[in-house]
Structure formats: structure tokens, C-alpha cells
UniProtKB/Swiss-Prot annotation:
Pfam families: Coiled. InterPro entries: HssA/B-like_chaperone, HssA/B-related. It comes from the Eukaryota. It comes from Dictyostelium discoideum. GO terms for biological process: sorocarp development. The gene is hssl62. This is HssA/B-like protein 62. Belongs to the hssA/B family.
Length: 85
């Protein structure tokens, strides 16, 4: 399945972060060096938001190609969280 992904990074200019996007029935995304990957959400999409180690905040979203977006995003500062749409 084709996945459209949009990644927004709000951080210091010299902050470099790696991101991983994978698809297994649903879409999942992991951001930040100290974050853990979210599992699939049964055909939906999952969002992981993590606060970077140097003070940067990273927000990632993976959306299925049908563009039926259900915006349900939470923000966790100082920890990580997973949300299923």
C-alpha cells in the first residue's frame, strides 16, 4: 500500500533526527533518538510524538493514500506517546 507521509520537525537548526516509517496493514512512524516505534493500529494510522534529547520537539504523521484524515494528535513533552486515529 502506498503511504503518504508528512513530517514536521521543530527544533534547533543543528539538530539532526532520524525517522522511520513502516507499513504493516496500518501506518506507523517513529521520531527522535529516544523514541520507540508505535505498532500498527488495525488498518488505521498511528502517530508518535517525542521530545528530542536536546530540547527539540518532533511531530510525525503517517496518512493512508485515501486521504481520509482523522486528526487526532496528542503532544507529549518529556516523554513519548502513541495515538491511533
Amino acid at each position: 500500500m502506498t503511504i503518504l507521509s508528512a513530517i514536521t520537525s521543530i527544533s534547533r537548526p543543528n539538530k539532526i533526527s532520524k525517522s522511520v516509517v513502516s507499513s504493516n496493514g496500518g501506518a506507523s512512524l517513529s521520531m527522535g533518538s529516544n523514541s520507540v516505534a508505535c505498532g500498527g493500529c488495525g488498518g488505521g494510522s498511528s502517530v508518535l510524538i517525542a521530545a528530542g534529547g536536546s530540547g527539540g520537539l518532533f511531530v510525525g504523521a503517517a496518512v493512508a493514500v485515501d486521504l481520509s484524515i482523522h486528526a487526532s494528535v496528542g503532544i507529549a513533552i518529556g516523554s513519548t506517546s502513541c495515538h491511533c486515529n
